Amino acid sequence: MTKVLVFGTFDGLHEGHKNFFKQALRQAQGKPKNRPYLIVVVGRDSTIVKTKGRLPKFNEQERLKAIQDSKLVSEARLGNEGSNPYKVIKEVMPDVICLGYDQTHFTEKLTEKIKEMGMNVQIKRLEPFEPEKYHSSLLNKT
């Protein structure tokens, strides 16, 4: 089994997120242990307030439940609370970490933090899927 890890807010699960999960699952193809196991880490409300300056439209439990209900996802969990957002990587021990095309929070030191943990993890930046149509910031405008 190839563990693929993704992170995000996922504030209203939409087709862009589903495409993101499908792209992440494809990253396991061609790997020695190629049965994909997709782990989704859902950002905590407190983390989102710190990084985006606002609460998400849906609270962390609602967002987690929506991800858990997705047939594409093997495991869903809330992100860590506290000062070490990278802790979950050591807990999960992924083979691949996939980042969204527009994902910037906690990514600038990701390679460095993985090396500090003594891990060998591939990091892949995935392609957008109709970002002018499927982006939570557009879909959640009310």
Question: How should these model regions be labeled?
Answer:
Residues 1-142:
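Nucleotidyltransferase catalytic core that binds NTPs
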